[in-house]
Each structure stands twice: as structure tokens, then as C-alpha cells.
Amino acid sequence: YKYTAFVVQDEVLKEKHGITDLDGLRRKAASIYDEMYPNDASVTDETDRRNSLNRFISYHLLNRIGNYYTLTCVDGPNSTLAINWDRNNWDIADWYETMMPHSLMKFSFPSGSAEGLYINRRGVQDRADYRGVFVPGTKVHTPEEMGGKNSAYNGIYHYIDDIVHY
């Protein structure tokens, strides 16, 4: 079985969230998921799927290989769909279940100045969608930005520019 991990580097955790250790990560996870799932806020066993840290980590994992250009149907800047799709009005997107139970992650590949792969983004190119909503999402680093090395023994990993949550 192969997996995909979306990894936030230590310096990003520190700069954006003040997280420098596991206890800081536990607190951040609790601040997100204890409010969303208040009945589970007292679950301290980190192997329990209801634990906030377990939810946080498992939301950053897919139970499949997800290469940069296969998480949406854009297989590069010159792909047929990228050229023929009305990308001025719609971003190309796809959804996947994560390892966090009952959760989805949206991947989109906008064009224009915001081009690249994003997680949980809403909008078109670098602006709001037709309903007036824009959520920038979390950018996935390209394999080239990672030095071309993102394989692991049991899957692959991608660096991302911020945490993601459900």
C-alpha cells in the first residue's frame, strides 16, 4: 500500500503558528478540532481516531499515491484540459478522501498568477469565484522546488506552505 503525505516544514510551523515542538502541535490541533468536535475534546489517547492530534495528522495523509500532476487532471502547463478548459471562469479541481475519517480534501490547479497546485482553495485564478468567495488555500510545492526528491519507502511526500485542516 502506498501513501501521500503533505508535510509542513518546521520553519513554516514556527513562523506562521509559533509551533516549535510536539506540545505546540497538540495545542494547535486542539484549537482546530476540539471546537469542531466538542464531544471528543477529552480524548487524550493519540491512537484514537477521535483525538485532535490524530485528526490533524491524518488529514495531511492520503491512502494513495498523489503525484503533483495527478491530483487534478492537469498533467502539466500544456495539458489538453489546461489549454481547452475555460480557466478564466473555473479552476480545475478534484477531491479525495483523507486518512481522517469522513473528510475530503480539495485540490485545485488555477491558471494565471496563482498557477500551481493548491489544497482547499476556493476562487478563480487570483480572485473570488462567481459567488464572491476567495479562500487562497495551501500551496503544494512542485517537485522542482523540493529538489526533485519526494519519494519515500511507502509512498511520496509534498511540502506545503501552511497547515491544512477540515
For each of these PLM feature ranges, what is it?
Residues 1-166:
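Mature exported/compartmentalized surface modules and terminal targeting/interaction regions
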